[in-house]
């Protein structure tokens, strides 16, 4: 089966709220995370900043897992700029440079319809090219908060994960409730109106992935954790049959006690795969800490591992390759 891995980049002002995102060493650095993640897949290190994206405690971006899987299985990667502050310095498809707004103050993405339409065209062209399966990953700091807002607006009681072991659920709840007050809705208030939920609370990554999924009629693997649950919920709300979709994530997301991945996936009605990666024996603390709940997923790590497994490699092979890449990074 001919598969293509897409990495969709997105930013939202929500990532600038202190304490909400650890997908960058500081809130300000989250602006650089999506392009830097994309660049690291192609170069030894990013061009846009002189280091790979890390959490404030120094844990490496999950892009290292995606890069490892790709070095093993050699699948093609296409970078898509859904809507970011900065363009990546790698070849990419430009959908928009629109960044999601802070939904506490204003609608997050009034341009959602326009982004979906453009991404849909790209999905249609990819279908014409003979590709049978899209595996779509994302890099979107703050995206678990926009995802949780969407799920709640659509009436799903889901709790999304976080790249931190201390999932800021209380802060997320306050931020979302403020957004709901601004929009004049309550929990489940936009049930049956996916597009309005996306306009009010979403981010450009979600709109791009929705458009790609509508335009491409083959199999789609939504390669992300709880953020892709929001995408699946929107697609379901738009009347899309989810039987050709699957979510591929990592076991760290599935095992996250502070989130509700399996329960919410079941409610939405989408099947899932969890990459069985294990860094507990790693010689590097930055990787061992994934087992303590740091990072968990992103940049399509679960989906990339799934492609490597389909190509005959084991999760252990991916882990070994990650170690090798990490050693290179810190030497």
UniProtKB/Swiss-Prot annotation:
> Where would one find the signal peptide in this protein?
none
Q: Which SUPFAM superfamilies match?
A: Nicotinate mononucleotide:5,6-dimethylbenzimidazole phosphoribosyltransferase (CobT) (SSF52733)
User: Which InterPro entries does the annotation name?
Assistant: Nict_dMeBzImd_PRibTrfase (IPR003200), Nict_dMeBzImd_PRibTrfase_arc (IPR002805), Nict_dMeBzImd_PRibTrfase_sf (IPR036087)
What are the GO MF terms of this UniProt record?
nicotinate-nucleotide-dimethylbenzimidazole phosphoribosyltransferase activity
Q: Which Gene3D superfamilies match?
A: 3.40.50.10210
Q: Which domain of life is it from?
A: Archaea
Pfam families recorded: DBI_PRT (PF02277)
Family to which the UniProt record says this protein belongs: Belongs to the UPF0284 family.
Alphabetized HAMAP family for the sequence: UPF0284
Q: What PANTHER family does this protein's entry cite?
A: PTHR38811, UPF0284 PROTEIN SLL1500 (PTHR38811:SF1)
For this entry, the protein name equals: UPF0284 protein PF0303
User: In which organism is this protein found?
Assistant: Pyrococcus furiosus (strain ATCC 43587 / DSM 3638 / JCM 8422 / Vc1)
